[in-house]
């Protein structure tokens, strides 16, 4: 009887050990894939080539995230919103996008410039050839919305 119990325990131990080994292999495979392709759906860390869907850290190459995505070393697109640029050719973001070191386009709206770039609207300039954007023009110069409205009213009363 003692021998039978001992055999059952050994068989159970062997099954658990095999199961643990399989889990470890799956975890290691996932780690390798994460390192290789990077990123996750949400709050995904970057990777060599990747990023995450939301709040994704960038990556070495072509990294970025959909929202609040950090850029990347090379061709790092920003994010849809509040996207950081990239070291080289880093596009900004759709909104409040930071530029990039080189040829960094600003953002669609309130885009910071870049080392060599500018933004579409309210864009800060750039170190070199950085054209800013100008939403309101008052007699050939940029002005605020309030000044623009006042100028329009003044022009309408004079005509």
UniProtKB/Swiss-Prot annotation:
Origin: domain of life: Eukaryota
Placement of Sequence repeats on the sequence: 38-49, 50-61, 63-74, 77-88, 91-102, 105-116, 124-135
Keywords noted in UniProt: Repeat, Stress response
Induction (UniProt): By environmental stress and abscisic acid (ABA).
Region (7 X 12 AA repeats of G-G-G-Y-N-H-G-G-G-Y-N): 38-135
Family the UniProt entry places it in: Belongs to the GRP family.
Name of the featured protein: Abscisic acid and environmental stress-inducible protein
Species assigned in the record: Medicago sativa subsp. falcata (Sickle medic)
